[in-house]
Amino acid sequence: MYKRQVSNGHTAAIFFSFKDSANKPSVEEIEKMWAEYKGVPQELNLPHAPKQFIHVYTEKDAPDQPQIKTAREIDGGMAISCGRLRESTQYDYKMVSMSHNTLRGAAGGAVLLAELLTAKGYMD
């Protein structure tokens, strides 16, 4: 295995299939679902929540994205990026996702969790 040193970012290559592959959504439908997704932090408009949780790169507009250096700072590093969504020969689809490991992961994730717990009344 070869590991390349990358600062402040995690990239995941994801392969997935649907339970009913014959009726799977199209690439465009999946990208639309991602782009429109809003979680509880967005619904509550928490201070450190990204405005758009999932930033979508389409094959048409950015076929080689996400890339660490260009995607890790989106929405203050709190958004995740998805792209390169393509049909797969072994699964229904394959894709690449990227997030900032300290801003979204450790530090920012802890701050966002504290904001959520406070908003839900678990903390003062």
Predicted feature residues:
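C-terminal substrate-binding/catalytic lobe of Rossmann-fold NAD(P)-dependent oxidoreductases
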Residues: 3-94
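NAD(P)-dependent Rossmann-like dehydrogenase/reductase catalytic/cofactor-binding core
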Residues: 73-124
